[in-house]
From Swiss-Prot:
The gene is Alg6. This is Dolichyl pyrophosphate Man9GlcNAc2 alpha-1,3-glucosyltransferase. The chain crosses the membrane at residues 3-23, 115-135, 144-164, 173-193, 230-250, 298-318, 333-353, 362-382, 386-406, 438-458, 469-489. One of its GO terms (cellular component) is endoplasmic reticulum membrane. Pathway: Protein modification; protein glycosylation. The keyword Manganese does not apply. It is a multi-pass membrane protein. It comes from Mus musculus (Mouse). Glycans are attached at residue 59.
Length: 507
C-alpha cells in the first residue's frame, strides 16, 4: 500500500499532461462546413437529445446522415445522450436542433474537454492503476513506472485530448475485461468487454483473443462438466449484455438492420485517408482500391486477416495463459489493423493498448512500437495543428521510458523474449549470436527515419505533382515497422514454451 501515494502523483502528472494538451486545437476547428470529429461528437449529442431513439440511425430532414451521422454502437449513443443532458443544463444552445450545427466557443470547448477527462477518470485511469498495481514479481517502483509510462502514452492523449474522441472509454472497458478474465472473474470480464464492443465496433480487433482464451479455459475444465457450465454462463452473460444495450433497437427488424449498416459501412472502401496498413501502402503502386470490385476487396482482406491471426489464436485456445492472452491481443489487433477492411489511422490505438500491457515484459520493443504508433498518426496530428503537443508528449514519454526502462540495455535474447527462437535458429546457424545487435540497429534506424520524416513534413513543401508525398512516406515507413512487429510478436507467441505452464493471475 505504500506505493499508492506515488500512484496518486503519477495520476496527477498524467492528468496535467492531458489537460495541457486539451488547451490546443482540435479536429476541424473553424473549418466549415463539415468541421471534424469534435463537431461529430457534439452533433451526436444534439441528435440523441432532440430525436427519439428510433430516428438516431435513420436519415431524415432532422438527421442528415451525410453530416456526421451516428455510426457507432448504442453505448456511444447513450453516452452522447448523457453528455447532452449536461450540456443542455449548462447552455441549451450547445445542443439545439439545427441551430447548434458547427457551434464553437471557449466555454463549449471547456465542456467537451471536461467530458473526455471525466470518462478517462471513471473508466480508463482506474483500470490502468489496478493493472499495474496487480503486476506480480516486480518491485513497487517498477509498478509505478509502468503506470506512469502507460498514462503518458502520447498516441491516446493526442487523439482524445487534441484531435478529440473518447477512445479511453472503449479501451478502458477492454482493459477491465482483460483484468476480469485474467483473474478468473470470467463473467465480469466478459461483461466489460461486451461494453467495450458496444461502445466501439472496432473492439472487434480484440474479440478473437477474448473468445479463444475463454474457450481454452472451458476446454481445460472439460466440456462435459465445469467447462460446459462456464461456457453457458459466459454465453448468457454476453447475450444478456448485448440484449440490454440493443433493446431499444430490437423492436423492429429494419431498425436493427439499419444500425448494423451504419456500424459496418462497406461502401466507404478498403481504407480511409492515409493509414499505415498494407492496403494503403500497396495502393501506392497497385490501385487496388479503385480497380478491384468491392466484394473482392472484402474477401481478400478477410482472408489475409484470418490467416495472419490464426496461428496465435489456435495456440491460445489449446494452451490458454494470461501471458499468451496479452501477446495474442497484440498480434490479433495488429493483424486487423494491417489487413482488415475499412481501417482508420486512429485504429492503431487498439494495438497500442495491449502493447502497453506487456511494457514491463518487453520494454524495448513496447516503447519502440508505441513511438511508431504515434508517428503513424502524424499527418492527422499536423492537420489538427498539434505539432507542439506531439513533440512535447513524445519527448516526455521517451524520457519516462528511458529513465525507468533503459531501452538499449534491455535487448538481450532473454529480455526480448527471443531466447527459444534464437536457440532454434542456432541449431542450423551456429554463428547466429548477433540478434540483440540487429534489434538495436533496427531501432536506431527506425527512430532516425521517423525524426527525419517529421522534420521534412514540417519544414518542406511537397512537390506540386506529389502533394501527399510526406503523408504517404510516413504511412509506408510505419507500415513496414508494423509488419516487422507482427512477425516479432508471432515469433514470441509461437516459440514461448512457458505459455502452457503459466497459470499466474497477472504476470
Amino acid at each position: 500500500m505504500e506505493s499508492w501515494p506515488w500512484m496518486a502523483v503519477v495520476v496527477l502528472l498524467g492528468l496535467t499532461v492531458r489537460w495541457t494538451v486539451s488547451l490546443s486545437s482540435y479536429s476541424g476547428a473553424g473549418k466549415p462546413p463539415m468541421f471534424g470529429d469534435y463537431e461529430a461528437q457534439r452533433h451526436w449529442q444534439e441528435i440523441t437529445l432532440n430525436l427519439p431513439v428510433k430516428q438516431w440511425y435513420f436519415n431524415s430532414s432532422d438527421n442528415n446522415l451525410l453530416y456526421w451521422g451516428l455510426d457507432y454502437p448504442p453505448l456511444t449513443a447513450y453516452h452522447s445522450l448523457l453528455c447532452a443532458y449536461v450540456a443542455k443544463f449548462i447552455n441549451p444552445d450547445w445542443v439545439a436542433l439545427h441551430t447548434s450545427r458547427g457551434y464553437e466557443s471557449q466555454a463549449h470547448k471547456l465542456f467537451m474537454r471536461a467530458t473526455v477527462l471525466a470518462a478517462d477518470l471513471l473508466i480508463y485511469v482506474p483500470a490502468v492503476l489496478l493493472y499495474c498495481y496487480s503486476l506480480k514479481e516486480i518491485s513497487p517502483k517498477r509498478k509505478i513506472a509502468s503506470a506512469l509510462c502507460i498514462l503518458l502514452y502520447p498516441g491516446l492523449i493526442l487523439i482524445d485530448y487534441g484531435h478529440f474522441q473518447y477512445n479511453s472509454v472503449s479501451l478502458g472497458f477492454a482493459l477491465w475485461g482483460v483484468l476480469g478474465v485474467s483473474w478468473d472473474w470470467d463473467l465480469l470480464g466478459s461483461l466489460a468487454f461486451c461494453l467495450a464492443l458496444n461502445y466501439k465496433q472496432m473492439e472487434l480487433y480484440h474479440s478473437l483473443p477474448f473468445f479463444c482464451f475463454l474457450l481454452g479455459k472451458c476446454f481445460k475444465k472439460g466440456l462435459k462438466g465445469k467447462g460446459l457450465a462456464l461456457f453457458i454462463r459466459i454465453a448468457c452473460t454476453v447475450l444478456a449484455s448485448f440484449l440490454l444495450c440493443w433493446l431499444p433497437f430490437l423492436t423492429e427488424r429494419e431498425h436493427a438492420l439499419q444500425v448494423v449498416r451504419r456500424l459496418f459501412p462497406v461502401d466507404r472502401g478498403l481504407f480511409e485517408d492515409k493509414v499505415a496498413n498494407i492496403w494503403c501502402s500497396v495502393n501506392v503502386f497497385l490501385k487496388i482500391k479503385d480497380t478491384l470490385p468491392r466484394h473482392i476487396q472484402i474477401a481478400i482482406s478477410f482472408c489475409f486477416t484470418l490467416l495472419s491471426l490464426l496461428p496465435a489464436c489456435i495456440k491460445l485456445t489449446v494452451r490458454p495463459s494470461c501471458k499468451g492472452f496479452r501477446f495474442t491481443l497484440v498480434s490479433c489487433a495488429l493483424s486487423f489493423f494491417l489487413f482488415s477492411f475499412q481501417v482508420h489511422e486512429k485504429s492503431i490505438l487498439l494495438v497500442s493498448l495491449p502493447v502497453c500491457l506487456v511494457l514491463t515484459e518487453i520494454p524495448f520493443m513496447s516503447t519502440w512500437f508505441l513511438l511508431v504508433s504515434t508517428f503513424s498518426m502524424l499527418p492527422l496530428l499536423l492537420k489538427d495543428e498539434l505539432l507542439l503537443p506531439s513533440v512535447v508528449t513524445v519527448m516526455a514519454f521517451v524520457i519516462a521510458c528511458g529513465t525507468f526502462f533503459p531501452m538499449l540495455e534491455n535487448t538481450s535474447e532473454e529480455q526480448l523474449q527471443l531466447k527459444s527462437f534464437a536457440v532454434s535458429v542456432r541449431r542450423h546457424l551456429p554463428g547466429f549470436t548477433f540478434l540483440p545487435r540487429i534489434m538495436q540497429c533496427l531501432f536506431l534506424s527506425s527512430v532516425i527515419t521517423m525524426v527525419l520524416l517529421t522534420i521534412l513534413s514540417v519544414t518542406l513543401d511537397p512537390p506540386q505533382k506529389l502533394p501527399d508525398l510526406f503523408p504517404v512516406l510516413i504511412c509506408f515507413v510505419s507500415c513496414v515497422n508494423f509488419v516487422f512487429f507482427l512477425v516479432y510478436f508471432n515469433i514470441v507467441i509461437m516459440w514461448d514454451s512457458k505459455n502452457g505452464r503459466n497459470r499466474k493471475k497477472i504476470e
